[in-house]
Every structure is written in structure tokens, then in C-alpha cells.
Regions:
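N-terminal targeting or signal-anchor segments and their processing/structural boundaries
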Residues: 1-411
Length: 411
């Protein structure tokens, strides 16, 4: 049988050290509790440097095990650095590529500090930009992989190409990858310059694929379009031309709908903006040649039918933001898994209303936007920079049809 939380203590001197240190750990951004976090104590003596977490084991180790609380025991009197580590390799060494880290900003002095009242927040650092590689994944489509978050990533074709040669570059959602589609060309390879500010890489990508993929178009709505959403169709190849004369868009009474079609600059999608009505059915027919992709191939006939919900099918959350100190905050509405549904920024007392919500459970996340850049920023250990503070409103918001919830948020 497993002997849990077993301790075996011995001393190489005349007595056993008896000081303790306790506290708790949380995720800096997500609401879920953390488990099995390593807590590391480094003695601040003449041999200590800030790089210690990267290259040597700590002086003391403990773990939260199956909770978010930790406790060190049998500690020696002195000054320490306290670090929390979500240690992917269980080697007690900080690897920024795989590990989350948290640190207590002040020196721990024992026996004065025995209980850390503020929670340690662990975060994943933003890695420095490094270009990885480029390769062809299908004829006419290349991918460029990189590490980190580039601030000004550009791709330039260096090979000699015809005047009508086109490229379309789109980021891959959720990945450190750029997709590049190019016009068909009879070459064995293409040379590109990849630049991010003053970091420049030159690469050659071999072209070996023989068959172009035909254009496929997929409706994203799933048959029901939320009243505040845009109608999108995703495509496997990026679209370069929309012929509205090959599109028929009507609602239930077969009355033509005025709309604006556009090509997304962020994803391989085509969008349709129109005045939506509650509890209405729509038909959208895309006839051949309505959409033309970068390879000059077009769609087959697509018959799409979808509807909108009635006004009574939606709920609403109204938040009274009490912010007397005028602190810049981002108020986010999330689903039960912490994915952002909607957000508003505020640095004053105001009412924020999240309307037309699908009935289900939501959370309210408050980001203290200390640098006022409109987004959450993670921390950095070497810079001794903590992640921007995040709080979750304690109550889950259960939205019901045709109902408004009202809450007060005190900043």
C-alpha cells in the first residue's frame, strides 16, 4: 500500500531544523485549481544567482500533491527565494518551453515568515521568437513554424517568379504557424526571407507535391446563427474573388436579402453581413464560380439553410462596475471552461451588458490591465515580472431564456 505524505527526517549535525513555511498556489489565468505543483526554496547565500532555477536543484523541495496547498518543514533559519513550478519533466529545473513558474517577489526570511498569505500564481512565460522551419504540406501550400509571439512577422519571396504570382499568408489559429498559399508554379523550390523586426532568416522550401486540392466550402453555423454573429463559410484554400451574381440569398418569404460579402484577412473564411431578424429562416445558394480560390478553382453548388432564434430564447447579464480608483480592467464573460465569450474594457464606473446570450452557465473574469494595452500579459521570471492579476467573480452565472441577471462588480 502507498504510504502517503511520509516524511523521513535526519540531521548531519547536533540538532534537527524545525522551522516551517506554508501557503497555496493558483493558476495565474484559469479558474481551475492546480495540483502536483513543486515548491522550491533556494537559500540566498553567496553562491546564489538568478540563474539557479535553470541549472541547479533547490535546497528544499515540497509539493502540493492533490491540493493547491503546500508546507515546508524542518527548514533552517535564513533568507530564501520561493518558487512554484509546474514541472513537466520532474527534474526540479525550470524549462521555459514546457514548465509554468511562479515566484514570491520578496525574500523569505525565516523564522519571521512562516505563512505566505498571498497565493503564488504560476504562469507560462512568453518564449522569445525563433524561426523553426518551412515545408510544403500540399501542392500550393507551405507552412512556416516558429517559436514565441513575433511582433512584426513578414514573409518575402526571393525566388524569381512571374508577375502574376500570388501569395496569401494566414496564421494558423492556436499554433505558432503561418500558412502560405501560392499560385501554381513550375519550380523545384522557392526561396523566402522570413523577418521579424531585425531577426532575418532565409530558407529554401522544396516543392514536391503533384496534385492541387479542389476547393471545399463548409458552413460554420451548424444550422443556427446567433443574432449577434456573422455568417461564415470556411474554405480549405483561401478565396481571392467573390462573384455576387452567382449568389442567391433569401429569407422565408423568398424575398432577396441585401448583404455584404467579404474575404477574411485573419482566416480562410468568407463572411456575409446582413440585417438579421429574430426567429427567421434563411436560404443562401452559392452557385458554381461564386467563390474562386488562389488556384483559380471554384466551388460546386452549395445550398445552405439556417435560422435565427427568437428574442425570448436569449438571456442577458448586466454588470454594474464599481471602479472608484479608475483602474483599467478587462471584464470577460467566459464559458464554464474559461474560454472567452465576450469582453469589455473599463476604467470607470459603468454598466456593462452582455446581451443575446445562449442559455447556459457562464463565469465572469476580471483582468487588471496594469499596462493598459487591452489584453492579459503573462509574467517573466528573469525580469521579476508577475503575470497581470486575474480574478473570477465567485458566483457562476446561469443564464436562462428571456431572463436578465444583474451583478455588482467591485474593483
Amino acid at each position: 500500500n502507498t504510504l502517503e505524505r511520509f516524511k523521513y527526517v535526519f540531521s548531519t549535525g547536533a540538532y534537527i531544523d524545525s522551522l516551517t513555511l506554508a501557503g497555496s498556489v493558483k493558476n495565474s489565468f484559469k479558474s481551475e485549481s492546480v495540483e502536483n505543483i513543486k515548491l522550491l526554496l533556494y537559500r540566498l547565500d553567496s553562491s546564489y544567482t538568478d540563474s539557479a532555477v535553470y541549472n541547479r536543484k533547490p535546497d528544499y523541495v515540497t509539493s502540493t500533491l492533490d491540493s493547491s496547498n503546500y508546507e515546508f518543514s524542518n527548514l533552517r533559519k535564513g533568507d530564501y527565494l520561493l518558487v512554484a513550478l509546474n514541472d513537466a519533466r520532474s527534474d526540479y529545473i525550470f524549462n521555459p518551453k514546457t514548465d509554468e513558474i511562479g515566484f514570491f517577489k520578496d525574500t523569505i526570511s525565516l523564522p519571521r515568515d512562516s505563512i505566505i498569505k498571498s497565493e503564488l500564481s504560476i504562469f507560462k512565460e512568453e518564449l522569445p521568437y525563433i524561426f523553426r522551419r518551412g515545408k510544403e504540406i500540399r501542392k500550393g501550400q507551405l507552412i512556416f513554424g516558429y517559436q514565441g509571439k513575433p511582433s512584426n512577422l513578414k514573409v518575402e519571396t526571393l525566388s524569381v517568379v512571374p508577375d502574376n504570382f500570388q501569395t496569401i499568408i494566414l496564421p494558423e489559429k492556436g499554433k505558432d504557424t503561418l500558412n502560405l498559399w501560392h499560385s501554381p508554379i513550375e519550380k523545384d523550390s522557392l526561396i523566402f526571407k522570413i523577418s521579424n523586426n531585425n531577426i532575418i532568416d532565409t530558407i529554401t522550401v522544396a516543392l514536391r507535391k503533384k496534385q492541387l486540392d479542389s476547393l471545399t466550402v463548409t458552413e460554420i453555423t451548424g444550422g443556427v446563427l446567433n443574432i449577434k454573429d456573422t455568417l461564415f463559410f470556411s474554405t480549405n484554400n483561401p478565396i481571392i474573388k467573390i462573384d455576387t451574381s452567382r449568389i442567391n440569398f433569401v429569407h422565408t418569404d423568398s424575398i432577396n436579402i441585401s448583404y455584404e460579402a467579404f474575404i477574411s484577412k485573419k482566416e480562410s473564411t468568407v463572411g456575409f453581413i446582413f440585417e438579421k431578424k429574430f426567429k427567421t429562416s434563411y436560404k443562401l445558394n452559392l452557385y458554381p464560380d461564386a467563390l474562386v480560390d488562389i488556384f483559380e478553382t471554384s466551388n460546386d453548388t452549395i445550398n445552405s439553410q439556417f435560422r435565427t432564434r427568437s428574442l425570448e430564447d436569449y438571456g442577458e447579464i448586466s454588470l454594474s462596475i464599481q471602479n472608484p480608483e479608475m483602474v483599467p480592467v478587462i471584464i470577460q464573460l467566459t464559458d464554464i471552461n474559461d474560454a472567452t465569450v465576450a469582453q469589455e474594457t473599463s476604467s470607470e464606473n459603468k454598466i456593462i451588458s452582455f446581451k443575446y446570450l445562449i442559455p447556459k452557465k457562464y463565469k465572469i473574469r476580471i483582468i487588471y490591465d496594469t499596462n493598459n494595452n487591452g489584453k492579459w500579459d503573462t509574467g517573466n521570471y528573469l525580469q521579476k515580472k508577475q503575470a497581470e492579476p486575474v480574478e473570477y467573480f465567485p458566483d457562476i452565472q446561469e443564464v436562462r431564456p428571456n431572463w436578465e441577471l444583474n451583478e455588482v462588480i467591485k474593483i
